[in-house]
Amino acid sequence: CIENQPALKNPTMKSIQMIIYSYFLIRGITSEDSSIEDILMINARNKLKAYDGEKIECDIKDKYKRTKYLGIKYCEKMIHDEDELFIEKFKESKKKDDLADAYLQGVYSSNIHVQKKNK
């Protein structure tokens, strides 16, 4: 899955998104020896849906900052009982928001994939 980028807010990132999409379309889906079946464009707000734990209080007004904060907190909760190496890397990272984004997006897209297979 690839995080969908807003075209008007950041056209450079939208271009990079489409380059990545094209690469995986050409090298992945059309290649006979590839295991890639589909390429999903995921809206950035959907990654927070991967978390189904207890509510985390947050009174941050700015939507962007609130989403970053909640993404980090959700990721911390979700990995708490998981891989110790990943937990340490996450705690030490200066880019927790990016790691949390990638993790939550992966969980969300995996959930979608499982739901599609179960239909």
Give the residues covered by each predicted segment.
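Phosphate- and other anionic-substrate recognition elements at nucleic-acid/protein interfaces
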Residues: C1-K119
